Amino acid sequence: MKTMHKLLLVFSCLALLAFSGCTDKKETVQPEPGWQVIDFVWSKENGDKLTLSVTVPEEWDKDSVRKEGCDSETFSGELYIDDKNGLKQAGSHGIVAVLDDGQSLQDAEIDACYPFGCLSTEYIAIGDNTYRRDNIQIDSKSAGLPSNVWTFANVYYFCVDNYVFDFFIYYSGVEIDADSYDHPQQEKILSSISISFS
């Protein structure tokens, strides 16, 4: 009889572990057709990692993720992805500011250093998150584009805990038409972002 009770106790514990999610198995959320998940990873010398996962269009080249000037002490430095024609599409500089307790995104001191200045700044809500969106001009003579097509970027700043991150998305517009980007696509990309530390 005692053996039966012990077996029941063991099975009960196993069932509780299974239903409480205490297993090594992780469900992978598959992106919609035409989309893919990529990871930007910043690593410190001590082995700590920051990962920004994001869902992006499939025509972007998953194997092209590049690093520029990454700081091995602060989880910062530019990581970006190109499309399959080698044109920069989007990226992040990792952690760009740290908020004090009680501060919000509006209080963040962000040293953006845009070479051509900022065309506009506004705060927008997408889902449950608030973003600061800086609209900037990148240049007026993009490689491989007609001379009247300029390159712009929307730089989105957002908070996770007390950390401020950025995520930028490039797009093209005819001369000064800075509002020519695909609004739903950019919102979808932003909504998919997740941050993890390991």
Describe the role of every protein-language-model region.
Residues 106-161:
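Signature of long, low-cysteine stretches enriched in small and polar/charged residues
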Residues 56, 92, 153-154, 189:
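Residues that flank catalytic or metal-binding motifs in active/ligand-binding sites
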Residues 84-85, 98-103, 137-141, 160-161, ...:
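Short, flexible beta-strand-to-coil junctions
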Residues 76-108:
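A short acidic-to-branched-hydrophobic micro-motif
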Residues 9, 22-80, 163, 168-198:
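N-terminal targeting sequences that direct proteins away from the cytosol to non-cytosolic compartments
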